[in-house]
């Protein structure tokens, strides 16, 4: 695994949480922790927190401070896919479900950020009752390198 040490806001520094790295903020330019926060992370990539250290450090961007965490690239994602494409072991090219209902409780699963271009369906879960009538299934998928 490609594990890295970085910093993240104390409130979201929990083992198992995932985040998408969005790049260096303007507030970070003069910070003494800039290098540890940003070096080695790839913009747009999703990371999973594998451990959290107890020490808390001050941060201008995160008013509640930051904690040191160990992260690894997240290779498994839970998303919604069209039922007609739902077959375990199948390799697919990613495309979001066509829907603009941002208030839908499934929106983030239909429009999952940080998704790889291609993935393999690892496990199928329950059928989803889509408010727009789309035939969808929740699935765990894995990145294909």
Curated annotation (Swiss-Prot):
PANTHER family: UPF0179 PROTEIN MJ1627. Belongs to the UPF0179 family. HAMAP family: UPF0179. This is UPF0179 protein Maeo_1037. It comes from Methanococcus aeolicus (strain ATCC BAA-1280 / DSM 17508 / OCM 812 / Nankai-3).
């Amino acid at each position: 695994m490609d594990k890295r040490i970085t910093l993240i806001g104390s409130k979201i520094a929990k083992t198992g949480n995932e985040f998408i790295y969005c790049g260096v903020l303007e507030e970070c330019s003069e910070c003494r922790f800039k290098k540890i926060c940003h070096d080695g992370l790839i913009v747009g990539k999703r990371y999973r927190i594998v451990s959290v250290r107890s020490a808390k450090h001050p941060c201008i961007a995160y008013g509640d401070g930051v904690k040191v965490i160990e992260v690894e690239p997240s290779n498994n994602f839970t998303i919604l896919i069209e039922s007609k494409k739902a077959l375990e072991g199948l390799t697919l090219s990613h495309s979001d479900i066509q829907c603009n209902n941002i208030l839908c409780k499934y929106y983030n699963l239909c429009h999952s950020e940080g998704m790889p271009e291609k993935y393999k369906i690892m496990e199928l879960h329950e059928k989803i009752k889509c408010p727009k009538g789309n035939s969808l299934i929740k699935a765990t998928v894995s990145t294909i390198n």
